[in-house]
Amino acid sequence: AKWYPEVRHHCPNTPIILVGTKLDLRDDKDTIEKLKEKKLTPITYPQGLAMAKEIGAVKYLECSALTQRTVFDEAIR
């Protein structure tokens, strides 16, 4: 949501697709431990959907940062 105000200001009619990346790390033990040290947890799919709704995004997608295939497939539809 960091860029949301700027995007809405400069491109008010542009549809937004919110993308949750690094899906492959959601279940990664090292990543989970590092997040726990900061009192954080990975973002869940329902949390991503809620954020998309909050900012008025037309779609919420998740992908592995390694492939980004899901996002590309959706973008060309």
Curated annotation (Swiss-Prot):
Superkingdom classification of source: Eukaryota
Chief location of this protein within or outside the cell: cytoplasm
UniProt cross-link Glycyl lysine isopeptide (Lys-Gly) (interchain with G-Cter in ubiquitin), position: 53
Chain's gene name: RAC1
UniProt entry tagged with the keyword Nucleus: yes
Domain notes: The effector region mediates interaction with DEF6.
Membrane topology reported for the UniProt record: Peripheral membrane protein
UniProt-annotated location(s): Cytoplasm; Membrane; Melanosome; Cell projection, Lamellipodium
Matching Pfam families: Ras (PF00071)
Family: Belongs to the small GTPase superfamily. Rho family.
Assigned keywords, A-Z: Cell projection, Cytoplasm, GTP-binding, Hydrolase, Isopeptide bond, Membrane, Nucleotide-binding, Nucleus, Synapse, Ubl conjugation
Catalytic activity from the UniProt record: GTP + H2O = GDP + phosphate + H(+)
Residues holding GTP: 22-24, 65-66
Gene Ontology CC terms: dendrite; lamellipodium; melanosome; membrane; nucleus; synapse
Complex formation: Interacts with NISCH. Interacts with PIP5K1A. Interacts with the GTP-bound form of RAB7A. Interacts with SRGAP2. Interacts with CYFIP1/SRA-1. Interacts with PLXNB3. Interacts with ARHGDIA; the interaction is induced by SEMA5A, mediated through PLXNB3 and inactivates and stabilizes RAC1. Interacts (GTP-bound form preferentially) with PKN2 (via the REM repeats); the interaction stimulates autophosphorylation and phosphorylation of PKN2. Interacts with the GEF proteins PREX1, RASGRF2, FARP1, FARP2, DOCK1, DOCK2 and DOCK7, which promote the exchange between GDP and GTP, and therefore activate it.
Post-translational modification: The N-terminus is blocked. GTP-bound active form is ubiquitinated by HACE1, leading to its degradation by the proteasome.
GO molecular function, one term: G protein activity
Top EC class for this record: hydrolase
SUPFAM superfamilies: P-loop containing nucleoside triphosphate hydrolases (SSF52540)
Biological process, per Gene Ontology: actin filament organization; cell motility; neuron migration; positive regulation of bicellular tight junction assembly; positive regulation of protein phosphorylation; regulation of cell migration; small GTPase-mediated signal transduction
Residues annotated as signal peptide: none
The protein's name: Ras-related C3 botulinum toxin substrate 1
InterPro entries hit by this protein: P-loop_NTPase (IPR027417), Small_GTPase (IPR001806), Small_GTPase_Rho (IPR003578)
Activity regulation, free text: Regulated by guanine nucleotide exchange factors (GEFs) which promote the exchange of bound GDP for free GTP, GTPase activating proteins (GAPs) which increase the GTP hydrolysis activity, and GDP dissociation inhibitors which inhibit the dissociation of the nucleotide from the GTPase. GTP hydrolysis is stimulated by ARHGAP30.
Organism ancestry: Eukaryota, Metazoa, Chordata, Craniata, Vertebrata
Stated role: Plasma membrane-associated small GTPase which cycles between active GTP-bound and inactive GDP-bound states. In its active state, binds to a variety of effector proteins to regulate cellular responses such as secretory processes, phagocytosis of apoptotic cells, epithelial cell polarization, neurons adhesion, migration and differentiation, and growth-factor induced formation of membrane ruffles. Rac1 p21/rho GDI heterodimer is the active component of the cytosolic factor sigma 1, which is involved in stimulation of the NADPH oxidase activity in macrophages.
E.C. code: 3.6.5.2
